[in-house]
Amino acid sequence: GCIASAGYQWSEVRNECIRIWEVGIELLNLDEISTSAAYLIFNQDSGKVEVFLPGDANIILTKNENNWIAVGSDFSIAIEGNSFVLYEKEVLKYRSEQGVPK
């Protein structure tokens, strides 16, 4: 298992223990009341992305043309401008500030 006390969590798409803030892309919560962030962890070919949401189970989305979706999930990820954006039920919830890697 992962050493949670050292900040490690299991990543399904990477198949290893990771520290999400070290390898993930941080998404800022657009709700002005909340300061919690979400993180995106991509697999090697970016065909799958694991979403780490505060307080929720991880969600794995699969690339579909220019976005990532999961059947039966309320979440989707897209690239808008130079940012990743996370939608829940078609409402924009999170946005990255660091830009989209090339």
Regions found by a protein language model. Name each.
Residues 8-15:
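Extracellular, cysteine-rich, disulfide-stabilized repeat modules with beta-strand cores
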Residues 15, 47, 66, 82-83:
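Beta-strand-connecting loop/turn residues
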Residues 20-69:
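Mature extracytoplasmic domains of secretory-pathway proteins
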Residues 66-73, 101-102:
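Short, surface-exposed linear segments at secondary-structure transitions and domain or protein termini
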Residues 76-102:
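C-terminal partner/receptor-binding element of secreted or periplasmic proteins
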Residues 1-5:
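Disulfide-braced loops of extracellular cysteine-rich modules
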Residues 7-8, 49, 83-84:
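Generic short beta-strand
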